Amino acid sequence: MLDIIKVIILGIVEGITEWLPVSSTGHLILVGNVLKPSMSDAFMEMFDVVIQLGAIMAVVVLYFHKLNPFSPRKSHKQKMLTWQMWIKVLIASVPAGIVGVLFNDILDEIFYKPIPVAVMLIVYGILFIVVENHNAGKKPSVTRISQLSVQMLLWIGFFQMLALIPGTSRSGATIVGALLIGVSREVAAEFTFFLAIPAMFGASLLKLIQFGFHFTGAEFGLLMLGCIVSFGLSVIAIKFLMGYIKQHDFKVFGYYRIVLGGLIIVWTIIQTVIA
């Protein structure tokens, strides 16, 4: 029963933080260290990634019409635009896809620790504040996904590649990259959601293969529960973010990241001293 409660809490954390640019990994590490689930470290490492399937399904459900090139409600032109959007998503996915397959384990081994995660939280928090101050009063040059050029897509893809470092935040990194080249906040956030679909499905599949699909019945149940909770909270988080950025900038998330990074550093130092 205690593990069920812990998994529900982790699902809530994943669902809320996956789409807000605050690093779901940073939060899962912090909450995981506090809750200390009784499952094996190998299972929890896989759980932290595969639980993202629930989050990504929220994007698929919320944007199904926009993502679906076969929708009977779309004209031929609209279907072609949808296919073009998917091509853009795939182009932007190339950098992270290549580096992720080749170096994901190495990056996790080096950076999947509280202090490196905290540092990345703070670094990108500062970046959000600097970029928003730089863009203040400027009109975005890109207000539709269809306006993104190949060069822009690879630039955004480069920032998604940087998000392979835990604590960076996939949504945070790609949004910062998009804002730097004049993309509007709404388009930056929406394209980030779409870009996450192949990245998160791929990462989850890779972890499942590495884990060998060797679940006990209890572990499979906990994984499904985490995904379901993550899905529900992700729907709420996505709707909140898209509504919020219509009236506000991303600086509040920058300040939050800096505070959270500082708290993780303090918490880690305290844990080290106590140990």
Regions found by a protein language model. Give the residues of each.
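Multi-pass membrane proteins that catalyze or facilitate reactions on polyprenyl-/lipid-phosphate substrates
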Residues: 1-275
